[in-house]
Amino acid sequence: MASSSSSRLLFLLSCSVLALLAGAEVHHHEFIVQETPVKRLCKTHNVITVNGQLPGPTLEVREGDTVVINVVNHAQYNVTIHWHGIRQFRTGWADGPEFVTQCPIKPGGSYKYRFTIEGQEGTLWWHAHSSWLRATVYGALIIRPRENKTYPFEKPAREVPLILGEWWDADPIQVIREAQRTGAAPNISDAYTINGQPGDLYNCSKEETTAVPVKPGETALLRFINAALNQELFVSIAQHKMTVVGVDASYTKPFTTSVLMIAPGQTTDVLVTMDQAPTRYYLAARAYDSAQGVAFDNTTTTAVIEYDCGCATDFGPSIPPAFPVLPAFNDTNTATAFAAGIRSPHEVKIPGPVDENLFFTVGVGLFNCEPGQQCGGPNNTRFTASMNNISFVFPQTTSLLHAHYYGIPGVFTTDFPAYPPVQFDYTAQNVPRYLWQPVPATKLYKLKFGSVVQIVLQDTSIVSPENHPIHIHGYDFYILAEGFGNFDPKKDAKKFNYVDPPQRNTVAVPTNGWAVIRFVADNPGVWLMHCHLDVHITWGLAMAFLVEDGYGKLETLEAPPVDLPMC
């Protein structure tokens, strides 16, 4: 075991003392989930927002602070809110995934989320975790250092959250419901957005293009968040270099690049020095799409970096802003090179030895259509997705955490397989058809408190190989290695980075490849692990860990709040 109850107790006690000494604050917010008329792409739609804003409110806190958010649901749909990347030590009831840690907040209902930020600094975000509501229900969560503590890099002249999103010229909930009804893939989005705006390459969008004002010579901290539902994105700024200094609320060794690749769920902090001629420059994002023969939104969203220099400030000048060079949509080499550049800032102590050595396949599959029905998938099938051939089924009458806490039988089992039930050539061009249909089930994997967990995440070429952003709730992890083809423990273990691997909460598993992650199971509760392409979690590309309590109060899940929603 990597941690003992005494060391954990001392850590939490020291955190509590430091919080008192540093004057940690309690932040109270109210989120009203409501329908709001929003005009994009020449049309007005009533979309679900928080407090009538798109994106929603930015939460700004310091490490050690406590956050209390009262979420009131005035919308027509059930809703939950997930605080993406927050560790939620012992406060799993506040994590937010629907039917995992809570039942949804029904229309007319409310729920008060309460949690403390422990040992995290940087950029995270919050979003709905019910159906496809996060298409418009999302916002930034900025964690700054404690008072009298500085960033591990030069203090920026300004900080700007830049949230990448997707926009449907339709109700996203109805888009996914229609896909679930027919078994077909859902309609692709009609635009990408930056801070809620598509940018001036789209119809009826020029005047509202997001602008980032800067001064010549200054350095800005740009906090990128990929909130897109289903698309990894390349990002670049014309004629400007970006220095990456953080990802997923973890600092990194600074490295300079002209292009970012950010998967849904991930965040990337960059420093940009405004050292070019004082005029206007496009900041642009477009798809990185690794799946072969799969439709995707091949448009480009833009914002404008505007030097405060007396140059034109409207969006109709005779000379347009300079445009960046973006990679081709299928440029896996660029995506791979960017991921390889991310490292922890210092040598880290990798947890070990490994207690749980797991191997999970991830990928899309197909269900046979029921007799007498017509289905919209290939050859009259229904799309599905799975981990280790288990297509995850969310309960509907209670949450997994509630069932675990109260010992309610029949909701889940704890026999999720540690390895694929059938071993095969995972990345072969022609995978046998009998492997295409997974088993639908609600299976969890049980972990002892303090156990060291290593997972090989292996993409498969069933239907199509694809880059999968895999997110674990309640945990950060170290990415020890990534590669292509089938993972070979004898050969590929030699590639493990035991010195300065990056720490993240979401890993983009390479298309036709694998990633190896490691973490300590030191947070009791039920924690979802899933693909952050929402179409894939809808199809079942998910599982959950049940982490047992440790010893004593500080290693035990807290009791549920009195206002926890019931199903």
From Swiss-Prot:
Binding site for Cu cation 4: H468, C531, H536
GO CC terms: apoplast
GO BP term, pick one: lignin catabolic process
The keyword NAD appears for this protein: no
GO molecular function, one term: oxidoreductase activity
Binding site for Cu cation 2: H84, H127, H532
Residues where Cu cation 1 binds: H82, H471
Keywords: Apoplast, Copper, Glycoprotein, Lignin degradation, Metal-binding, Oxidoreductase, Repeat, Secreted, Signal
Binding site for Cu cation 3: H129, H473, H530
Signal peptide (residue range): 1-24
EC number: 1.10.3.2
Organism superkingdom: Eukaryota
Sequence ranges assigned to domain Plastocyanin-like in this UniProt record: 32-148, 158-310, 415-551
Localization, UniProt: Secreted, Extracellular space, Apoplast
Residues carrying covalently attached carbohydrate according to the record: N78, N148, N187, N203, N298, N330, N379, N389
Protein name: Laccase-3
Annotated organism of origin: Oryza sativa subsp. japonica
